[in-house]
């Protein structure tokens, strides 16, 4: 699918020094920022489409690749549920929060956090 907004992969650095990739889409005239937290399947085409949708509505958006803690560029098919759950179980909530915080810090003030599936649970933790 082609999008009007330019996207790119960037590198974030968490407070513990860990570097992770993140999918980034910039709005033309941003009104705020959003961190989109992935599903158990990684930064899928669906998550990238969600980022583009938010950017087309005026938000700078970053989706941190939180599985980079143990393997880079993990993107699973939606049929690979068991593998996705396995990756989720390997990642501690503390490390996930550190990576989400790195995305929030990169975007700055006026930043919201939203997640889908596993990301929804992490969004709840990030808000508490």
Q: How would you name each of these model-derived features?
A:
Residues 1-128:
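N-terminal cap/leader regions of alpha/beta-hydrolase-fold enzymes
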